[in-house]
């Protein structure tokens, strides 16, 4: 029952007569509907219902939602015309008329997901409906506000709804403040502040904020930075503006806008998108530029904010972060193929063929219940026409926590990322990226055929910006993806966000490259906390530069990556070197031999949580594609795990045939491994194959094998002890001055620049020197006293010399490989071979030790032993001889004692050749000749 009140404060709400406001308080209307339509022409954000009376004509009409409820999320699509409210008084102050019971009612949506459109109208040039553009779940397709607008009347203190088309700022204190419902965002204020920011921002403001004496940028402090950016966007025809959010903090007028961007990204980013278009038009008109304005009107500009605060850990995200802008860092594990994501659904009536377009609201299609034509109004007659719908490119990326964000004793968390349009395929598995996006949650159906939802919601990040470069890491070698770029015909800058090198940085790089001690300077800068090991550091330095990957038109591809193995005694800093290289490589994976399996290194089959389909997950070697894979405890690997490395280290591919998935994956990575000798102590009296538990075919695939031995030397031990104790007293080693070590940021920038821009070509003089050095290394095996020649070098050593020479020339920023580059490569190869391929019995280099595990002398001794066994068996009177008697007679004819294991090995070889027959087992074994041969 309605009660009439005489209180003046309730008169406006309960009175059955419409309220006519004071005409003097009406704010001025702007001629340009840049942000709003009037209430009579827009798709209003206020919906009501009145079944008791007809409304008079000539007033503004607002569409009504049937059965509207404050608890329902409406669709952003067009709604059917139902009952109409009367809008009286000044335009924009909307109040409902009284119902039959004398009580007025409001029917509105708590949160409508509308946002700003383009500066042109929602109609095309010919007056026809135009499909609106929309980025991700951020709507920019309507000139109405993203949410319902509220007027706050300062005179009465009463909140009233407002759909005014005025965009002018309030000029009097008595005028209402217009904000988006549910937020503190004023569209007009936000637009004005961001426009002033774009037109007036200078880098001196950021310099003051950061309190830095030097700002790394190619602009002066007084230059209008974003004016230059907008002009470059217009000239290049691009539509994306990367916005450093900290610049908003540096500009005093946009400090509040920075916090609004973090808390209400869906609304603020839409306003920024529209403001950029208005600024582009203003720049063209004000400067009288000869440019087609229609092209600006039809283009969809996007703001991509980043650097919105410190990066959060994935396990720190909570419900308070939903619908807010966040920063995340992680490792890309997997990315799906491109998915067509429906943005605008197209419906057609099966009765009258009337069509209508419906925008998707948070992944939900608000299907029309009946035809919107008044003459038809047929229920359940609208059907979806797929080929008339609008779709956008979408990709889902699996992001995992990096080790620095994982607490002790915890397993890494992962989260799903959704990227759209230009960000699709912007990163690959193995990339370390920093993303900026909106944290969202969506309900999950208990059954796909029912509408029952689970109480737990699924979360994901709607990405607006992706950054892949760290100042302390190298950039990805673009030569590894050259073939992919040629096939896709895209610019590599769109695929990889490489580090921006300024003119000042380039001048410093040239200055360092001109130093005479460049080679030793860069080598000292590699792991400066590790004492000495100069040759090891030089080899790793050349590995970071790498050779040049070559693909020939006649077929065939030659790798430019360099593989290095560190072998030696414990406590010789092998693992620390691996850790340092892993920290500065862009796509490196650090793993241990004992904790790795074959599928963990290559790829494995798993079932996707979302689609329930079998998918291929990348392993450590695939994730290191284009980087360096560091493997510690290489000798502890199982045989099945090591077998997969043979193809990777030479062909740089991984062949997979599992669960119906047959494919070949790229593994174009360098291998840096470390191994401990058998018994944890290297025995110099044994060859390298007997000291290291590695098969010879795998050992021969390493370009450089360094023996890091712990030798007793009083002078060296004293210097090493001083170095270690100084590390506990200061962060910088005592024997190295500040000028002798380059900062890690500059070192990575130098290497990245060389890998990106320097591709040396081998000259004729270098070619002649390579041939001469290779032939000279082969001649080292000549021995006039022996019929069989020792192999001291193979073609793999020649290819290794070519790669090292290219890396040395690339280090000096030279476009050609000269004689000195080849000489240094030959020196490194000979130094490494001298250590690990020397026969301890003869003191000579023998590559058979590395390739077959046996030297020429050992092979000759085994042949002589087999010949002696055959002679003993032929000279005996009986048909067979016991094994113990055979050992006794062999030792009688030999000057040196022959071990039973050597005799057993010789018998096994003779038995395989069907020359002898061994009967029995153990000490009862007997040996006789095979007379049938």
From Swiss-Prot:
Catalytic activity, reaction form: ATP + H2O = ADP + phosphate + H(+)
Gene3D superfamilies reported in the protein's UniProt record: 2.20.28.10, mini-chromosome maintenance (MCM) complex, chain A, domain 1, Nucleic acid-binding proteins, P-loop containing nucleotide triphosphate hydrolases, Winged helix-like DNA-binding domain superfamily/Winged helix DNA-binding domain
Subcellular location per the Swiss-Prot or TrEMBL entry: Nucleus
Composition-biased stretches (Polar residues): 49-59, 69-85, 117-129
Enzyme Commission numbers on file: 3.6.4.12
Keywords, alphabetical: ATP-binding, Cell cycle, DNA replication, DNA-binding, Helicase, Hydrolase, Nucleotide-binding, Nucleus, Phosphoprotein
Disulfides per UniProt: none
List of residues that carry Phosphoserine: 52, 56, 69
Pfam families: MCM, MCM4_WHD, MCM_lid, MCM_N, MCM_OB
Keyword Nucleotide-binding appears in the UniProt entry: yes
Oligomer and partners: Component of the MCM2-7 complex. The complex forms a toroidal hexameric ring with the proposed subunit order MCM2-MCM6-MCM4-MCM7-MCM3-MCM5; loaded onto DNA, forms a head-head double hexamer.
Record function comment: Acts as a component of the MCM2-7 complex (MCM complex) which is the putative replicative helicase essential for 'once per cell cycle' DNA replication initiation and elongation in eukaryotic cells. The active ATPase sites in the MCM2-7 ring are formed through the interaction surfaces of two neighboring subunits such that a critical structure of a conserved arginine finger motif is provided in trans relative to the ATP-binding site of the Walker A box of the adjacent subunit. The six ATPase active sites, however, are likely to contribute differentially to the complex helicase activity.
PANTHER family: DNA REPLICATION LICENSING FACTOR MCM FAMILY MEMBER, DNA REPLICATION LICENSING FACTOR MCM4
Protein name: DNA replication licensing factor MCM4
UniProt organism field: Saccharomyces cerevisiae (strain ATCC 204508 / S288c)
